[in-house]
């Protein structure tokens, strides 16, 4: 899930920044939708409406693009048994995802993808349960045994069945609203300190972009915290689908993997992987592995 969250947040920041810039330029040129009056004061109601529109449109555009972005950025090759000649391992992967998806009650099977990487990673993404993607790295299939792979895939299918991407999008929309709102207030305050009137619009424009990026990074802490919370639910869902023993085995395999990789590789594992570091941090998308195992065993 970590790779998915990272791509979603990155896409979201780019989208809301682009939308904000376009709307600001249109507003400056036409005066339509401006939240700054002729007297230089901010209309809080107009700014809040503007922020909500940009925030939620941005988050839902990011959701709509999530599957395409994941395929493009990760180089995911979608496995289609009806059109492509698959290897035995690839066919096994497709069959496993479909079997677990049916067990989870999904009416339409997710796309199944694989991408070349030595990293142990898997993620699920997509705008809805009916338009989802479950992808794994070749490194995961190479490093893990069948039972661990089953647990990892069950965990990702549980994310799809739980509708975590849509819930995350709603949360991101709220965060975006605050980001856009606060960044423009901060930019307005900053522009008030500019003595040359002709430079005020330029300073305000640049300050909006800078503050929006800063607040977006800070706002991502809320999304990361929620992501860590949802991981426990996906672990339980994975245990229901594959069995608790396989889910625990998958987590222990991830723990063993993160223990033996080189320190230089640990940074890559920290925020982007299904495992994350063994110890969680504010910027982790996943909680402490030991805590995940403890909670699952106590289930």
UniProtKB/Swiss-Prot annotation:
Its cofactor is Zn(2+). Belongs to the peptidase M48B family. The chain crosses the membrane at residues 5-25, 44-64, 170-190, 205-225. One of its GO terms (molecular function) is zinc ion binding. Pfam families: Peptidase_M48 (PF01435). The active site is at 156. Keywords: Cell membrane, Hydrolase, Membrane, Metal-binding, Metalloprotease, Protease, Transmembrane, Transmembrane helix, Zinc. Zn(2+) binds at residues 155, 159, 231. GO terms for cellular component: plasma membrane. It is found in: Cell membrane. Its main location: membrane. It comes from Bacillus pumilus (strain SAFR-032). Binds 1 zinc ion per subunit. This is Protease HtpX homolog. Its EC number is 3.4.24.-.
């Amino acid at each position: 899930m970590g790779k998915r969250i990272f791509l979603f947040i990155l896409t979201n920041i780019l989208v809301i920044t682009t939308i904000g810039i376009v709307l600001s330029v249109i507003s400056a040129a036409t005066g339509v939708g401006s939240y700054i009056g002729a007297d230089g004061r901010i209309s809080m109601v107009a700014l809040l409406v503007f922020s909500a529109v940009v925030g939620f449109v941005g988050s839902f555009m990011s959701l709509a693009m999530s599957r395409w972005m994941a395929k493009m950025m990760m180089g995911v090759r979608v496995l289609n048994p009806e059109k492509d000649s698959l290897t035995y391992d690839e066919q096994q992967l497709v069959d496993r995802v479909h079997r677990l998806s049916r067990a989870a009650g999904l009416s339409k099977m997710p796309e199944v993808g694989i991408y070349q990487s030595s990293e142990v990673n898997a993620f699920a993404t997509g705008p809805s349960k009916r338009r989802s993607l479950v992808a794994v790295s070749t490194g995961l299939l190479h490093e893990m045994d069948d039972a661990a792979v089953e647990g990892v895939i069950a965990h990702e299918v549980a994310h799809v069945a739980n509708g975590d991407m849509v819930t995350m999008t709603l949360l991101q929309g709220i965060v975006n609203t605050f980001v856009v709102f606060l960044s423009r207030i901060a930019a307005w305050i900053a522009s008030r300190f500019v003595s040359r009137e002709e430079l005020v619009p330029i300073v305000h424009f640049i300050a909006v972009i800078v503050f929006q990026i800063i607040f977006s990074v800070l706002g991502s802490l809320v999304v990361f915290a929620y992501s860590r919370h949802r991981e426990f639910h996906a672990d339980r869902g994975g245990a229901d689908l594959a069995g608790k023993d396989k889910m625990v085995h998958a987590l222990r395999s991830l723990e063993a993997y993160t223990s033996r990789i080189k320190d230089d590789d640990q940074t890559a594992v920290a925020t982007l992987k299904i495992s994350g570091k063994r110890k969680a941090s504010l910027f982790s998308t996943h909680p402490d592995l030991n805590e995940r195992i403890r909670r699952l065993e106590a289930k």
